[in-house]
């Protein structure tokens, strides 16, 4: 597919990086030479210097015959104008990054009037992911599938976990809960486990099931299921505002610490139910006087990775039960994994995953296309959701044990008429099923791709 990305900052670069790996024809447009130099030296893309909302620049980029134009500059209005012009020039599909909460309320109208196919908001997406993780305190990541009927959670193994030292086949035979362990990370090794796999201390495991069954399994492992009732948020960013709204709906008490006076005033107006604290969130005296580390949860959301990392580690050492930090630099994210800090949030990667899913669905509009996509274990493994249709010749009505599945493909769960099925050898795929596939095979676009 011919794809134009307007804006090559952190978000645009992450999108370009993923889509070039998918072997698409990518053109990036930016008015900052430094952004283009980075893309030109590290990615297989065509770079064009200029304003992405300019007709002449879009024409030079080839918007007239583009399959998709993605506008992700730092200015909402520029993105909307770019998408409008590109669509009028002949681009088949357009996506715009829109961060302003006021525009968010008008998203449906914007899609209709401007012809947008998709509106993305990295800040809102990050806030929603943080809220999901806070609702599952034992997990370091939570990803919903099948409209929220099933979740995939990631968690680090602790010495007290009852699953340690036992094969998965032995563990699952007990049928404590209808769940499936579908992926694992051990050091630098990424594993799609079979029944002989034996979990070890410090392994990171990924498990699939309904919320109720996952809770049942975690409880059987000795994990605490106590709800996070109050959260301290460091930084008064847009993500903080969206997160505060999400947490307020769940009845969670929120404290937001922000140093900028004007931001504090805006936050106090937008978040009447939250406690807004003006001050330096890294100041030990402030932390003690406001008891910020006395909360059940701590979320570091400043614009500086270093500050987020240091404060998250301090919160962990102080005994805060659930700690999360926003990170943008890949090298920092690797460092954090080594510290065992746990939950790391990367807004740019969340959005890149969403757009990759959308692009794969466009590339396979006639078949059983990807409906959800989640990259785990550093992108080495993917979890994909498909809906089976009558086009699935060779896959439907056949017991899984008789299907010639590709090596590295695992069918983790099926949702049929609202009921979650953890598949066994005699399970079949039927039309209308939501099928969750976990694989280390890159670039699957159709459910049929699971066959060898």
Language model regions located:
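Cytosolic regulatory regions of ion transport systems
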Residues: 1-452
């Amino acid at each position: 597919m011919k794809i134009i990305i307007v804006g090559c900052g952190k978000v645009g670069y992450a999108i370009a990086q993923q889509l070039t790996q998918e072997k698409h024809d990518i053109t990036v447009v930016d008015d900052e030479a430094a952004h283009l130099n980075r893309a030109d030296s590290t990615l297989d893309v065509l770079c064009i210097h200029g304003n992405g909302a300019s007709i002449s620049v879009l024409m030079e980029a080839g918007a007239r015959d583009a399959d998709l134009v993605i506008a992700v500059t730092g200015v909402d209005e520029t993105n909307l104008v770019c998408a409008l012009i590109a669509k009028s020039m002949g681009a088949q599909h357009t996506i715009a990054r829109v961060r302003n909460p006021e525009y968010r309320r008008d998203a449906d109208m914007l899609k209709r009037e401007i012809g947008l196919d998709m509106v993305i908001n990295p800040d809102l997406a990050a806030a929603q992911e943080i809220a999901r993780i806070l609702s599952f305190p034992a997990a370091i990541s939570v990803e919903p599938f099948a409209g929220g009927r099933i979740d995939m959670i990631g968690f680090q193994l602790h010495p007290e976990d009852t699953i340690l030292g036992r094969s998965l086949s032995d563990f699952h035979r007990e049928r404590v809960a209808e769940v499936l362990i579908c992926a694992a990370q051990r050091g630098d090794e990424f594993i799609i486990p079979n029944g002989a796999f034996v979990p070890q201390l410090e392994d990171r495991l990924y498990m699939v099931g309904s919320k109720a069954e996952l809770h049942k399994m975690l409880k059987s492992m000795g994990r605490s299921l106590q709800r996070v009732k109050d959260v301290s948020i460091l930084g008064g960013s847009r993500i903080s505002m969206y997160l505060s709204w999400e947490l307020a709906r769940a009845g969670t008490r929120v404290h937001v610490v922000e140093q900028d006076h004007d931001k504090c005033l805006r936050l106090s107006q937008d978040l009447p139910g939250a406690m807004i604290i003006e001050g330096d969130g890294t100041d030990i005296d402030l932390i003690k006087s406001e008891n910020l580390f006395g909360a059940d949860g701590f979320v570091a959301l400043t614009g500086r990775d270093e500050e987020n990392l240091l404060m998250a580690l301090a919160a962990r050492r102080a005994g805060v039960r659930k700690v999360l930090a926003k990170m943008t630099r890949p090298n920092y994210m690797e460092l954090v994994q080594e510290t065992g800090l746990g939950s790391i949030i990367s807004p740019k990667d969340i959005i890149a995953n969403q757009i990759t899913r959308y692009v794969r669905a466009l590339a396979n509009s006639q078949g059983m296309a990807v409906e959800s996509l989640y990259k785990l274990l550093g992108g080495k493994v993917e979890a994909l959701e498909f809906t089976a249709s009558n086009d699935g010749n060779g896959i439907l009505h056949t017991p899984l044990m008789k299907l010639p599945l590709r090596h590295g493909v695992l069918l983790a769960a099926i949702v049929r008429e609202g009921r979650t099925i953890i598949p066994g050898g005699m399970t079949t795929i039927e039309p209308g099923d939501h099928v969750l596939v976990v694989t280390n095979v890159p670039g699957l676009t159709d459910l049929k791709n699971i066959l060898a």
